[in-house]
A protein has these predicted regions:
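Short pre-active-site segment immediately N-terminal to the catalytic Zn-binding motif
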Residues: 15-41, 51
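Nuclease and nuclease-like effector domains acting on nucleic acids or nucleotide cofactors
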Residues: 1-3, 37, 62
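Glycine-rich loops and low-complexity Gly/Arg-rich segments
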Residues: 29-32, 53-57, 64-65
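Metalloprotease/metallohydrolase-associated module, dominated by Zn2+-dependent proteases
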Residues: 2-6, 11, 66-146
Length: 146
């Protein structure tokens, strides 16, 4: 299955600023015609995180779907983004009150970099063996390390 889409129209539509690549629902979309191995490893780490979050959300979602409402099944593909968003928001509030410099987008950048998902991907993107050596749920170890 093709998971990297180069020169993606969707990537060009949704990405802004210096961002050129995104992992979206398990697919890697990029504005570029080719990616470095470092960027591919970074985005593949996000792919693994996404599928692990789907696994975590699957059991409660299926149970709630049978006993409450089938709408709970939407939690499975959205859990990664919900977790990412909540984590980013908490980090944003933290950095609003603790950073010396608030203007110029620094708070948002600091909140983005403080994400457990981003920390794992960024710290291991230069290791060519990381994806083979990586343990399930490795991103969980980065919580609380702002």
């Amino acid at each position: 299955m093709k998971t990297i889409y180069y020169n993606s129209k969707l990537a060009k539509l949704i990405l802004f600023g210096s961002y050129h690549t995104i992992m979206l629902f398990g697919f890697i979309l990029t504005k570029l015609k080719e990616l470095s191995e470092t960027t591919i490893r970074h985005e593949r780490t996000h792919q693994k995180q996404f599928f692990e979050c789907m696994e975590i959300a699957a059991v409660p979602s299926v149970l709630l779907a049978f006993h409450v409402s089938a709408w709970w099944l939407l939690l499975i593909p959205l859990f990664y983004y919900i977790l990412y968003g909540v984590e980013w928001f908490i980090s944003l509030v933290y950095h609003l009150f603790t950073d010396d410099e608030v203007g110029g987008g620094k708070v948002n950048a600091n909140a983005y970099r403080a994400s457990a998902f981003e920390m794992e991907a960024k710290l291991n993107q230069d290791n060519p063996n990381y994806l083979k050596e990586r343990k399930w749920g490795a991103w969980l170890h980065y919580y609380g390390k702002i």
